[in-house]
């Protein structure tokens, strides 16, 4: 009898956790829907041209991951970024402030942001947008393997024909090129695919 009660208790805990996660997901969906309807998130363009602009410097914005393990993998995967055609390209990197000492790419401009996992809007978003909107980006890349609303919202407010991110429940709303690593679970493969896109 005790085992049955323990089993029921465990099942009820799993059920409560499942309901909590469902409510959290539903809340996030409503927030994205509301922000889209009110213009606080811009709708993704449906048309896509896979050729970057010719003859002009290519402007590329790369948002590095907000969690440290993914950030370290991304830094390693992109260590050779810009070694070819560096004169033609202008890179801007967005990096979390607490990773400043870990970031060693020697090309482009770096912008450092403050962020906590509870933030749904980036701290200092207005100033960041003012600075970034001075550029017309050919491609914007979000290297966060897990969905981050604050980053996706920022990207939605910037102009670019190509927006690259990892596939998630919400990625259709924000990215017109999506990388799915759900089967392999190896984010470095996704980073290599992005490197290939940037090398074209």
Language model features by range: what are they?
Residues 1-19:
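N-terminal amphipathic/basic-hydrophobic helices that include classical n-h-c signal peptides
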Residues 115-180:
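Active-site and donor-binding regions of nucleotide-sugar-utilizing enzymes
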Residues 82-86, 90-131:
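Conserved nucleotide-cofactor-binding alpha/beta core module
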Residues 69-71, 98-104, 173:
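Short, charged/polar "capping" segments at the starts of alpha-helices
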Residues 14-29, 170-200:
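Active-site-proximal region of nucleotide-activated glycan assembly enzymes
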Residues 63-67, 95-97, 143-145:
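Structural motif
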Residues 24-59, 69-71:
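Short N-terminal or domain-adjacent regulatory/targeting segments
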């Amino acid at each position: 009898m005790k085992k049955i009660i323990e089993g029921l208790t465990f099942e009820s805990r799993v059920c409560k956790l499942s309901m909590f996660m469902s409510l959290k997901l539903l809340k996030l969906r409503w927030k994205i829907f509301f922000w889209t309807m009110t213009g606080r998130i811009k709708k993704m363009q449906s048309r896509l041209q896979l050729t970057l602009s010719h003859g002009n410097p290519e402007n590329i914005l790369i948002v590095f991951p907000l969690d440290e393990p993914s950030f370290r993998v991304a830094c390693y995967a992109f260590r050779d970024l810009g070694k070819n055609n560096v004169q033609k390209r202008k890179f801007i990197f967005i990096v979390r402030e607490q990773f400043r000492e870990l970031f060693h790419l020697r090309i482009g401009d770096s912008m450092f942001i403050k962020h906590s996992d509870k933030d749904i809007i980036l701290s200092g978003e207005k100033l960041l947008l003012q600075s970034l909107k001075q550029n017309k980006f050919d491609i914007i890349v979000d290297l966060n393997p897990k969905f981050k609303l604050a980053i996706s919202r920022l990207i939605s407010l910037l102009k670019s024909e190509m927006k690259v991110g990892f596939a998630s429940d919400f990625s259709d709303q924000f990215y017109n090129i999506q990388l799915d690593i759900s089967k392999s679970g190896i984010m470095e493969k996704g980073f290599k695919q992005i490197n290939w896109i940037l090398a074209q």
